[in-house]
Amino acid sequence: MDLNTILIIVGIVALVALIVHGLWSNRREKSKYFDKANKFDRTSLTSRSHTQEEMAQPNNISPNTYVENGHTPIPQPTTEKVPSEAELIDYRQSDKSVDDIKISIPNTQPIYDMGNHRSEPIQPTQPQYDMPTANNVASMTLEQLEEQSRNIGFNGINSSSPELRVQLAELSHEEHQVDYNLSFNEPKAETTAQPKQTTGYIQLYLIPKSSEEFNGAKLVQALENLGFILGKDEMYHRHLDLSVASPVLFSVANLEQPGTFNAYNLAEFNTIGIVFFMQLPSPGNNLANLRMMMRAAHTLAEDLQGVILTEEQEIFDANAEQAYLARV
């Protein structure tokens, strides 16, 4: 065989090896996005939806409810809530936990034990200062001077004397200055900043409130209205400049395996949910991109009647949102 034939064969083998390696790497990357998707099933969605409906019910029941189709008002009896035995037990346990609380100041002994002195709270001690001797008239208050004069049995000091009142005013001014200095010298609590996440993925889940599934046509329309484009790996991506040529800020994948959207059957499929994910570091500002992804998730939740969950499959409330923002 001549040299040209050998080179052609070697090139073909190398090309096939590159293609196989690329397909294998692509499948491995996809599996990272959806490891947690297997945890979702129909049963868990149904139970979570019932829990969400119970949480969403108002505490106060209106006096009249309406029949679903007839709009006929039905009077509802007003009942007074009676605490159950479980609530009384919880109250006793919380009361016991309060007894175990001890209030203390740093570098000092506890000044108040709620368990041992519940009915006799100790008043906080005031700082004691060494005042001048009793010979100095200005060191005594007006009431002390009058009491001393009555005890001694002489006419005493004239409390209406202008000189005495000037001295008392100066003493009061000095005491206030001492209090101000003490307040400025109080130790301040040290705050430790949490480390920021610089690599990996940040994810949010969106599932239906009820046991039903998301309609594919409505889901696709809502995603396109928010600027998502179906692109690489058959997923929807939010680009920087709303064009496929610009970098991807974050993406949306199908919660059902293999996590893709069939481009030829988008109007006829249903899904149990979708997942938002953003890879760190992201193009531009991580915090701004994360806020944009959260707004997109909230908008889709309102349009599709869905519920947003965290990576731990908990309700994405205001506290969870602040925790997410603190990560970047």
UniProtKB/Swiss-Prot annotation:
Composition-biased stretches (Polar residues): 57-67
GO biological process: one example: division septum assembly
InterPro entries documented for this protein: Cell_div_ZipA, ZipA_FtsZ-bd_C, ZipA_FtsZ-bd_C_sf
Membrane topology, record value: Single-pass type I membrane protein
Residue span of region Disordered: 43-82
Major subcellular location class: membrane
Residue spans crossing the bilayer: 5-25
Location(s), subcellular: Cell inner membrane
Topological domain ranges for the Periplasmic compartment: 1-4
Known partners and oligomeric status: Interacts with FtsZ via their C-terminal domains.
Function text: Essential cell division protein that stabilizes the FtsZ protofilaments by cross-linking them and that serves as a cytoplasmic membrane anchor for the Z ring. Also required for the recruitment to the septal ring of downstream cell division proteins.
Name this polypeptide is given: Cell division protein ZipA
Species: Haemophilus influenzae (strain PittEE)
